[in-house]
Amino acid sequence: MELGKTKSVHIVGIGGAGMSAIAELLLTSGFGVTGSDLSSGEVTERLSERGAVIYQGHKAEQVGESDVVVYSSAIRPAENVEIVAAEQAGIPVIKRDEMLGELMRYNYGVCVSGTHGKTTTTAMIATMLIEAGESPTVMIGGVSDYLKGSTVVGSGKYLVIEADEFDRAFLKLTPTIAVINSLESEHMDTYGTIEELRKAFIAFANKVPFYGRVICCVDWPEIRKLIPHLNRRYTTFGIDEPADVMASDMVMDKNRSRFTVRASGKEYPGVSLNVPGRHNVMNALAAFASGLELGIAPERIIAGLTRYSGMRRRFQIKYDNSAGVLVVDDYAHHPSEVKAAVKAARDGWPNAEIVAVFQPHLFSRTREFADEYGWALLRADKIYVADIYPSREKAADYPGVSGSLVAAAVHKAGGKHAEFIADRELLYQTVETCPQKSTVVLFMGAGDITHLSTRLAGEWINKFSA
């Protein structure tokens, strides 16, 4: 793979899921990669081991003699000293999505979009193609144990990636197959209205060439609204609404799911997933429909889905003992994702006590969706809400907005046990004392709440295995 005379790439915010995936692909393709992030961790350590030069914090001199600087939509260019230094030095500065668009020019692109389920569905399609011997190149915004990372550079023609709607990033991509998993209100700071968001998805879908295909889930009302505006071939999938590819006979048993797929007038029973939840069945349908379009034999699709082993931070079980006590870590941060994670726990472990530990993500999202979070958390037996993970936002810009809004919303929705605990150590101590019997402790959020799940799992492993 060549990008003109480019030999060295500097990535600002290299520790992020999407940025680290680009870094891994560039490293594997022989490019020199440097990068900076405010904090270090497992992701930056892995990149360093693969040959990247990683800096903690941002400094102008770290740009060095890079040929191009890449940054994510979460970065404010005018406030970043590295980007300013690059511009002053005449070094091209581009967003992540533009780099992705360039990388796609060398491959047959399978792009997975949607408000929810992008990472899991992308990983399912990747696993299916690898098991079918297609050797795809894969870029996922998360870490897959099966893939041993977030990126695989294959020798085949397919490039399978997530297509993120944030900041209209996916409109830079040129998919041959465009998957639309789900669609509802999200990123209103970018779009303003659901109508504008829907228009963006229509534009993304219609970028598919005449020989490509759009694969979309008709269980979402907003997707049903966009279908009449598609001017490309499309395949539908769903569970509740009539569709070209459907699931039935679903059985949930702990962290496993079984179901039958109906497609093209045929039935394929006994499809098995090693992940729980109705939402994962839906993700598998998207992968199944994609496989059929790519000409993969149904039995090989099913074999690939069976090999899918989940993603880190997607209902990741970090601790499980013989007494039925589990620690689960999940990336859920939108109300629909939170609801799906709680439902997966409730359906898979119907006799267990479900303890939900939720960290809201972004002040703007918490303010907009507080009531929806209340309803989403309602099926948990105990609910503990941490303070908000701010990410790119500042608390001073959102006076009066805190995790207490979510706890209050749970009570408003009829929940009896919901508590806001801002102090992180107190939150940990409270959760640690919860299990008295079969219990699923479900940590949810896109921020640093994951560290508490790791700490709790580690402590219980040491405590109960001693």
Curated annotation (Swiss-Prot):
Annotated compartments: Cytoplasm
Pathway: Cell wall biogenesis; peptidoglycan biosynthesis
Keywords, sorted A to Z: ATP-binding, Cell cycle, Cell division, Cell shape, Cell wall biogenesis/degradation, Cytoplasm, Ligase, Nucleotide-binding, Peptidoglycan synthesis
Pfam families reported in the protein's UniProt record: Mur_ligase, Mur_ligase_C, Mur_ligase_M
Enzyme class: ligase
One GO CC term on file: cytoplasm
Main location class: cytoplasm
Binding site for ATP: G114, T115, H116, G117, K118, T119, T120
Gene Ontology MF term list: ATP binding; UDP-N-acetylmuramate-L-alanine ligase activity
Coiled-coil intervals, chain numbering: none
Tagged with keyword ATP-binding: yes
Family: Belongs to the MurCDEF family.
HAMAP family found in the cross-reference section: MurC
Protein name in UniProt: UDP-N-acetylmuramate--L-alanine ligase
